[in-house]
Amino acid sequence: MGLTRALASELGPDGIRVNAMAPGATVTEVPRESITEENLKAVVRETALRRVGTAQDIVGPVMFLVGPDSDWLTGQTLVADGGVTYA
């Protein structure tokens, strides 16, 4: 977060926006094979939405950050973690 803000301050005068994405636990085929069922259940319990994220859950926020709707944002870290941060 600090690096994102520092770079945004430094590069902003040149019209360069700097934002970051902070995804939570996201299961894809590769990690799914390496995580135990017990660990997966523990992650779900810690998530406000009571499920693990998927790659598709991350696509929307990323598309927002790279699209024109975020033209006024810089120095931000978008947390997409299903509510783990606040649960």
Please give the residue ranges for each predicted region.
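Conserved catalytic helix of short-chain dehydrogenase/reductases
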Residues: 1-10
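Short-chain dehydrogenase/reductase
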Residues: 4-5, 59-62, 66
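Alpha-helical segment proximal to the catalytic Tyr-Lys
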Residues: 9-13, 71
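A glycine/serine/threonine-rich, flexible loop-to-helix segment
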Residues: 13, 25-47
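Active-site loop of short-chain dehydrogenase/reductase
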Residues: 13-16, 76
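Conserved SDR Rossmann-fold cofactor-binding beta-strand/turn motif
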Residues: 17-27, 66, 79-81
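A conserved structural motif in NAD(P)-dependent oxidoreductases
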Residues: 47-58, 69
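Short C-terminal tail/terminal secondary-structure segment
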Residues: 62-63, 74-87
